[in-house]
């Protein structure tokens, strides 16, 4: 790379993204929250406050003169509620709902179609056969080595329909949507768990982001230490909050701030689409972070987003809502079998990330051969992350690849 300070910055970025799937050393677009932000406060009529706040954000950001607006519609609670309030607020606006259908993946597109019809929105389904095909173009926009870039396809489609794109971003982090994580974390820890034990338990709840032999991935130029990773997460768990609230804090200060927001914002700028996120307004962030925990998550039934569900019940019957959280997600095992394995073999067998001394060639060859026999999802995810790093390297370090290159 050349400059030593640039090298160090990039090495840190590489380690973080390949372990956490985000880089917490970057400056976030919205402020991090502290543990004090998650102290409970008594509230009255929270559903009314939340709904009116979302409605006011829509009016403020869009106005009554706008003729057409796009919405990302996964079929889940957050996007369905956002669509419901959008239609109830702007009764005459033309709404284009966008859903993504990935080949070989389970999705909520059929559910989304019913919800779109209910609120008189034109439903557009973007079919993605090869999820990795336009990876060089997407990486050239965000300038970071990420592979899971579904938002690229959403915004690209939105640009052809409207100058506005509204979404339900923030619902999981602010209203308790990661129920699978809460249940697992609480089962792995207790009130006497140390800070380090809770950090390790939290990482276990993100086990698809890293692999058991994580430290062996890196080569001589990049020194990996789990202790450095623990240090990033420590403020979220070294505080007097109850364990559940500590997870709320860690979730907000993690992928939301350092993955989804910066990446989505880069796509919005590139395609010149104005984003509207009614759930993620500063007003709602300040309000919802202090909500009593039992208004977010019911541990007995393992159900989250309790307040959003209550509001949405005014607009939709329960049977119209997806029972299992899905969102826009690709089946990585099927992606690996159809395109990922061949692309990783082609680009990583003589990878520039190996020549640069970043990634361990022996690890690549050993794990690749094992994946041929048994594609484990954690290692598939890791190889897709390494493929993204290889593309980033060829775009910005060796500069031998063009953004228009298609991975086929």
Model segments located where?
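N-terminal glutamine amidotransferase
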Residues: 1-41, 56-59, 151
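Short, hydrophobic/amphipathic alpha-helical patches that form generic packing surfaces
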Residues: 7-21, 250-262, 381-398
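ATP-dependent adenylate-handling active sites, centered on carboxylate activation for C-N bond formation
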Residues: 35-244, 266-315, 332-333, 382, ...
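Acidic, carboxylate-rich catalytic segments that either coordinate divalent cations
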Residues: 10, 354-408
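Conserved cytochrome P450 K-helix E-x-x-R motif and the immediately C-terminal K′/meander segment
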Residues: 261-263, 315-318
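Active-site-adjacent bridging/hinge elements
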Residues: 126-134, 257-262, 283-285, 357-367
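PAPS-dependent sulfotransferase catalytic core
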Residues: 318-376
């Amino acid at each position: 790379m050349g400059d030593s300070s640039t090298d160090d910055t990039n090495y840190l970025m590489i380690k973080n993204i390949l372990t956490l799937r985000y880089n917490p050393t970057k400056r976030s677009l919205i402020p991090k929250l502290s543990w004090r932000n998650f102290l409970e406060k008594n509230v009255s009529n929270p559903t009314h406050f939340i709904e009116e706040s979302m409605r006011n954000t829509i009016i403020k950001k869009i106005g009554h003169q706008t003729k057409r607006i796009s919405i990302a519609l996964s079929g889940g609670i957050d996007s369905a509620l956002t669509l419901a309030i959008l239609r109830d607020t702007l009764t005459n606006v033309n709404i284009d709902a966008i859903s993504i259908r990935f080949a070989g993946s389970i999705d909520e597109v059929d559910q989304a179609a019913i919800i779109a019809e209910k609120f008189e929105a034109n439903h557009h389904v973007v079919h993605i056969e090869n999820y990795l095909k336009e990876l060089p173009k997407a990486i050239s926009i965000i300038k970071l080595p990420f592979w899971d870039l579904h938002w690229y396809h959403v915004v690209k489609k939105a640009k052809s329909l409207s100058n506005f794109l509204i979404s339900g971003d923030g619902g999981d982090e602010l209203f308790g949507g990661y129920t699978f994580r809460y249940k697992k974390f609480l089962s792995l820890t207790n009130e006497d768990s140390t800070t380090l034990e809770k950090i390790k338990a939290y990482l276990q709840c993100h086990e698809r982001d890293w692999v058991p032999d994580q430290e062996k991935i890196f080569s001589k130029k990049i020194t990996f230490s789990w202790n450095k990773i623990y240090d990033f997460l420590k403020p979220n768990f070294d505080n007097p909050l109850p364990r559940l609230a500590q997870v709320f804090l860690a979730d907000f200060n993690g992928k939301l701030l350092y993955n989804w927001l910066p990446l989505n914002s880069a796509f919005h700028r590139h395609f010149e689409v104005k984003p509207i996120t009614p759930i993620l307004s500063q007003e709602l962030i300040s309000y919802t972070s202090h909500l009593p925990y039992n208004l977010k998550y019911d541990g007995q039934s393992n159900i989250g987003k309790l307040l959003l569900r209550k509001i949405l019940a005014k607009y939709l019957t329960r049977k119209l809502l997806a029972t299992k959280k899905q969102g826009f997600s690709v089946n990585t095992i099927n992606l690996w079998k159809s395109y990922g394995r061949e692309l990783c073999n082609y680009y990583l067998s003589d990878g520039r990330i190996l020549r640069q001394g970043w990634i361990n060639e022996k690890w690549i060859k050993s794990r690749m051969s094992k994946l041929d026999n048994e594609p484990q999802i954690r290692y598939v995810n890791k190889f897709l992350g390494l493929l993204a790093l290889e593309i980033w390297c060829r775009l910005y370090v060796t500069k031998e690849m063009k953004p228009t290159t298609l991975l086929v």
